A protein has these predicted regions:
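Pre-Walker A adenine-sensing motif
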Residues: 53-66, 70
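Charged, amphipathic alpha-helical linker segments immediately N-terminal to NTP-binding catalytic cores
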Residues: 1-49
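Globular "head" domains of long coiled-coil molecular machines
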Residues: 66-331
Length: 331
């Protein structure tokens, strides 16, 4: 009964999404302005970029419906504990932790029953390969002394630079926690190096969710449970302060808007900081289009003069989140 109802609802949702796509295709064929009575042209309230963005949104929803996939986007500042939270949900360490921004590109972590060892798929690696070729030439021509002045060159960065000089490309497939850690760390160091060498990182090539890296692994807490239709996927998003790249804010907003729900990880000790404010603004920009939840991390660092749990919920719900989330959605 439950499975049949779910199937019928998904079929109806898919029909409505396909109908919306057809309507957009009709809009694409219409002129962007029409003659007015007195004025030569009257602008219509849509544009080609707007239509393209709507197409991307509908395609993303169709992809989720076809897989019955629930995508929970997780957002937070660099030190709020976002990676730790994701690792806790998965039940094993699938994301590395370093004392620097670690999510240059959004990453999907998908529950895959029976997949005990994590595997990372990075099929859309071509833009990274092109970037490596550009960086290879820049490294040959650059002043290393100047580079060390603008970039912290630790052992990981030095290994990456050596890899670029040798022309070693990224793989499309990584099996096991350590190879995955190495890939993700290298991607983030690649962002830092590209910025230092004044080379544009191809963020736009990874705007579509089907192009970003995907980690597949069995979530420990879901192992052995009765099988139900559907799939749970976490989306690790770049925080607004990740990698010092302001234009990542647009990518963050797009990814949040396309998720099934959003979980914001806030640092209890930094609730009124600028960085946490940027996270809250990104969440508020989503509005009521997706369900919102908040996880307050590091609450154990309170002292006897600190607000209690109910006071913190009231602060976040009312003052910080401007009433767009109820205290019951704050944990």
């Amino acid at each position: 009964m439950y499975t049949q109802t779910l199937y019928e609802l998904s079929q109806e949702a898919e029909r409505l999404l396909q109908l919306s796509r057809q309507q957009l295709q009709l809009l694409e064929k219409m002129p962007l302005s029409v003659p007015g009575d007195d004025a030569p042209q009257l602008a219509l309230p849509w544009s080609q970029p707007n239509i393209a963005e709507r197409h991307a949104m509908l395609n993303n929803e169709l992809r989720k419906i076809s897989r019955l996939e629930m995508v929970l986007a997780i957002v937070g500042t660099m030190k709020a504990g976002k990676s730790t939270t994701i690792n806790a949900i998965v039940g094993t360490e699938v994301l590395p932790n370093r004392n620097r921004p670690m999510t240059a590109l959004p990453t999907l972590i998908r529950h895959m029953p029976g997949q005990k060892e994590p595997v990372l798929h990075f099929s859309h690696v071509a833009p990274i390969d092109c970037l490596i070729q550009k960086l290879q030439q820049r490294l040959r021509d650059c002043d290393i002394k100047h580079l060390t002045d603008v970039l912290e060159i630790d052992k990981d960065m030095r290994a990456l630079m050596q890899r670029i000089e040798n022309g070693v490309a990224f793989e499309k497939y990584y099996l096991g926690a350590q190879p995955i850690f190495h890939c993700l760390k290298s991607l983030n160091d690649l962002v830092r190096l590209a910025k230092a060498l004044d080379v544009d990182f191809p963020f736009s090539a990874y705007a579509a969710i089907e192009h970003i890296p995907v980690i597949e692994v069995e979530f420990v807490h879901l192992a052995g449970l009765e099988s139900y239709p559907g799939q749970l996927t976490l989306l690790d998003t770049p925080g607004p302060n990740e990698a010092g790249q302001p234009h990542l804010q647009k990518m963050l907003n797009q990814q949040l808007a396309r998720a099934s729900a959003v979980l914001a990880v806030l640092d209890y000790t930094q609730l009124k900081s600028i960085s946490d404010e940027e996270v809250r603004e990104a969440i508020l920009a989503v509005g009521q289009s997706v369900p919102l939840y908040v996880l307050v991390n590091k609450f154990d660092q309170q002292d006897r003069n600190s607000d209690d749990a109910d006071q913190v919920r009231a602060l976040i719900s009312g003052t910080l989140m401007k009433g767009c989330i109820t205290p019951q959605q704050i944990f």
